[in-house]
Amino acid sequence: MARAVHRSGLVALGIATALMASCAFAAKEVVVAVGSNFTTLDPYDANDTLSQAVAKSFYQGLFGLDKEMKLKNVLAESYTVSDDGLTYTVKLREGIKFQDGTDFNAAAVKANLDRASDPANHLKRYNLYKNIAKTEAIDPTTVKITLKQPFSAFINILAHPATAMISPAALEKYGKEIGFHPVGTGPYELDTWNQTDFVKVKKFAGYWQPGLPKLDSITWRPVADNNTRAAMLQTGEAQFAFPIPYEQAALLEKNKNIELMASPSIMQRYISMNVTQKPFDNPKVREALNYAINRPALVKVAFAGYATPATGVVPPSIAYAQSYKPWPYDPVKARELLKEAGYPNGFSTTLWSSHNHSTAQKVLQFTQQQLAQVGIKAQVTAMDAGQRAAEVEGKGQKESGVRMFYTGWSASTGEADWALSPLFASQNWPPTLFNTAFYSNKQVDDFLAQALKTNDPAEKTRLYKAAQDIIWQESPWIPLVVEKLVSAHSKNLTGFWIMPDTGFSFEDADLQ
């Protein structure tokens, strides 16, 4: 009898030990619920922040930005700039390999920048690199980049999420299909991409930073509906969700297993007006529409208070941003201006949105109602990523159907040029970049160009202020709000957060 008891005890002990072992070695798998789908996994060919954020799973750049949007070294150790501002010499880290075993070195950097700066490749981010005259591999750990003209923000271009180092062997193997076959130096490598449902990445065993990554896998799952994203957190289907529906923030905050975070943002939301098309070619119409929108009410209705009314065309936290007296809500003034412009009974137009998630839908509905109060009938359309790429980003001025366009912008380089030039410079009309107002002003162009030729902060301040003064006066936009970034995560997930440009930082992420 004693022997039987002993045997049973051993069996029980064995089962308990097995269970403990399975718990101890349980895979650390994280699901991240995000607000829209991905367009490509090639950072050089992605126009949206989300696709580039997910690409950080595989890819790294020479430099990056920290949570305060300050420059940091990543694959580079240091850099120097020539006195004439034309030559950047970058020293690289040694001993790093791509996920396919290829060495990371100066030749790899050259291959990437040569590809990015070649207009024949028709990459969507070409404009970031068009000022590169040549890239030279001086030795395995030294790269020399020569510019066509001085560009004082160039090091920030190298820190942009688009400037990722892709394996040159993979570039040669996959060519234009590299967006489906990412191979970088990052902490994770591609496991599965179901293009309608999710991207799953797995730990890269050969990652160069000791002890990282700590997670075994991350699944990036697009969930357009705000309420569904929040519900996935509460049921444990997801461990991180962004953006969080503002109206549910208070509810999630009460959940003892979930941590809610509201973090600073450089995400500006606005409506551009196509100034090459009637009636938006009339400055009085554009002024009227700015008076027609009650921004403080919009903050409450669509953002549940997690935003601030815009006071300029550049978010205040970006260097050289200018703030102005906010547009007051004055529908009477709006109707007067419309009458003066020749539209006493208003007009009909279209209002498109770059996203189709629930918050965007609320902004569209609110704006539609506000415009109706001053006689403007707006037919609204909320686009998915594919529609946006085809109908907005892919068409030039003559064929574009854009009239009013609700979207957002975050200057992911952390500096003023990328907050202004892509959106207001004459040469940056779609399909080149994102000047969806098709705005053009020679003085603005000149001020922006001059600001890139000087390293003097006082002169930069003067030039960027002059450009913003003109833009604010001519009103090609209806500036709406600067968002606060509301995310939530399971309390056992650490080291995973939202960057001010709405990208993600997760290199230290862990499940406790």
UniProtKB/Swiss-Prot annotation:
GO molecular function term, any single one: peptide transmembrane transporter activity
Domain of life: Bacteria
Coiled coil: none
InterPro entries per the UniProt record, alphabetical: Peptide/Ni-bd, SBP_5, SBP_5_CS, SBP_5_dom
Gene Ontology biological-process annotations: dipeptide transport
PROSITE patterns in UniProt: SBP_BACTERIAL_5
Keyword Nuclease: no
Entry GO CC: ATP-binding cassette (ABC) transporter complex; outer membrane-bounded periplasmic space
Compartments it resides in: Periplasm
Signal peptide: 1-26
Keywords: Periplasm, Signal, Transport
Disulfide topology: none
Gene3D superfamilies: Dipeptide-binding Protein, Domain 1, Dipeptide-binding Protein, Domain 3, Periplasmic binding protein-like II
Biological function: Part of the ABC transporter complex GsiABCD involved in glutathione import. Binds glutathione.
Subunit structure, as described in the record: The complex is composed of two ATP-binding proteins (GsiA), two transmembrane proteins (GsiC and GsiD) and a solute-binding protein (GsiB).
Family: Belongs to the bacterial solute-binding protein 5 family.
Name recorded for this polypeptide: Glutathione-binding protein GsiB
Gene symbol of the encoding locus: gsiB
